[in-house]
């Protein structure tokens, strides 16, 4: 699968939103989801970095971090995926075995991780810092997130027009105390760390 990340000097203005082409997530196995679980991502980029906007629909059931959960000095919330609903972005700008994982919660918490994932072994660097910026807002029927990730998180160099990176886009949510897993490109089992299923991100 392929998605276009569109060049925009002002990626969050209303004109850009109207002209965006959204990614829609499915169940991790490729099945469709109910309307109140719909999740959409819009992707943009410019000379400063990579931008994402996502809409996550809900039916009033949103899993939040316990209030006492610590936010670390670098701004991260450790093991965010296990204690909160999250939208996730996995991106590889080089070899598929090396990628970045970004997690975003409805309450504005985040987690960024550098990963080396070779056959039979996965190394995870929780101390890595991407210097991302994130804000979120919760509405009656959906919550919305805005993300900026500078190019320094991907080696420091912006892509050229026509370049192709690889990645996948996910959401973990809870309904009636059951965890559900959504993906843009299906991964066929409950394990998002399968770079062989990353789709193409084309910079246009």
Name what the model sees in each region.
Residues 1-204:
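Structural preference for beta-rich elements and adjacent junctions enriched in aromatics
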């Amino acid at each position: 699968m392929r998605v276009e990340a569109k060049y925009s000097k002002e990626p969050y203005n209303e004109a850009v939103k109207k002209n965006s082409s959204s990614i829609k997530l499915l169940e991790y196995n490729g099945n469709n989801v109910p309307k109140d679980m719909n999740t959409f991502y819009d992707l943009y980029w410019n000379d400063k970095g990579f931008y994402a906007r996502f809409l996550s629909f809900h039916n009033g059931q949103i899993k939040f971090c316990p209030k006492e959960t610590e936010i670390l000095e670098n701004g991260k919330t450790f093991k965010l995926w296990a204690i909160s609903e999250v939208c996730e972005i996995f991106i590889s700008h080089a070899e598929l075995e090396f990628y970045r994982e970004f997690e975003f919660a409805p309450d504005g918490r985040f987690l960024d991780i550098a990963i080396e994932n070779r056959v039979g072994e996965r190394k995870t660097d929780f101390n890595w810092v991407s210097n991302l910026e994130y804000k979120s807002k919760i509405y009656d029927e959906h919550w919305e997130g805005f993300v900026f990730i500078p190019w320094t998180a991907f080696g420091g160099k912006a892509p050229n027009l026509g370049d192709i990176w690889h990645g996948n886009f996910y959401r973990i949510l809870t309904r009636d105390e059951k965890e559900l897993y959504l993906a843009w490109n299906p991964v066929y089992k409950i394990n998002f760390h399968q770079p062989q299923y990353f789709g193409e991100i084309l910079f246009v």
